[in-house]
Amino acid sequence: MSHTVKIYDTCIGCTQCVRACPTDVLEMVPWDGCKAGQIASSPRTEDCVGCKRCETACPTDFLSIRVYLGAETTRSMGLAY
């Protein structure tokens, strides 16, 4: 089943989500939008198993990373209406 991994610009570049991912879906890439100078990226979403460990690991008040599971993707992102 296909999942969507969305990373928001509230990412603080802490790498917690990258370290929490058991399937190495995430990696850090250079970004000037935060003090850390990097942001999470999801180049391998086809390997996402939907465990949402990345969401749990995210320390920001508004989760900077969200995993939308298969059919819930369009509904959760507000695209189904």
Curated annotation (Swiss-Prot):
Annotated GO MF terms: 4 iron, 4 sulfur cluster binding; electron transfer activity; metal ion binding; oxidoreductase activity
Main location: membrane
EC numbers: 1.97.1.12
Cofactor binding: number and manner: Binds 2 [4Fe-4S] clusters. Cluster 2 is most probably the spectroscopically characterized electron acceptor FA and cluster 1 is most probably FB.
Cofactor: [4Fe-4S] cluster
Domain 4Fe-4S ferredoxin-type: 1-31, 37-68
Subcellular location per the Swiss-Prot or TrEMBL entry: Cellular thylakoid membrane
A Gene Ontology cellular-component term: plasma membrane-derived thylakoid membrane
Sites where the protein binds [4Fe-4S] cluster 1: C11, C14, C17, C58
InterPro entries reported for this sequence: 4Fe4S_Fe-S-bd, 4Fe4S_Fe_S_CS, PSI_iron-sulfur_center, PSI_PsaC
Catalysed conversion reaction: reduced [plastocyanin] + hnu + oxidized [2Fe-2S]-[ferredoxin] = oxidized [plastocyanin] + reduced [2Fe-2S]-[ferredoxin]
Keywords: 4Fe-4S, Electron transport, Iron, Iron-sulfur, Membrane, Metal-binding, Oxidoreductase, Photosynthesis, Photosystem I, Repeat, Thylakoid, Transport
Membrane topology designation: Peripheral membrane protein
Domain of life according to the entry: Bacteria
GO terms of biological process kind: photosynthetic electron transport in photosystem I
Residues that coordinate or bind [4Fe-4S] cluster 2: C21, C48, C51, C54
Quaternary data: The cyanobacterial PSI reaction center is composed of one copy each of PsaA,B,C,D,E,F,I,J,K,L,M and X, and forms trimeric complexes.
Reported function: Apoprotein for the two 4Fe-4S centers FA and FB of photosystem I (PSI); essential for photochemical activity. FB is the terminal electron acceptor of PSI, donating electrons to ferredoxin. The C-terminus interacts with PsaA/B/D and helps assemble the protein into the PSI complex. Required for binding of PsaD and PsaE to PSI. PSI is a plastocyanin/cytochrome c6-ferredoxin oxidoreductase, converting photonic excitation into a charge separation, which transfers an electron from the donor P700 chlorophyll pair to the spectroscopically characterized acceptors A0, A1, FX, FA and FB in turn.
Protein name in the entry: Photosystem I iron-sulfur center
Species assigned in the record: Acaryochloris marina (strain MBIC 11017)
Gene: psaC
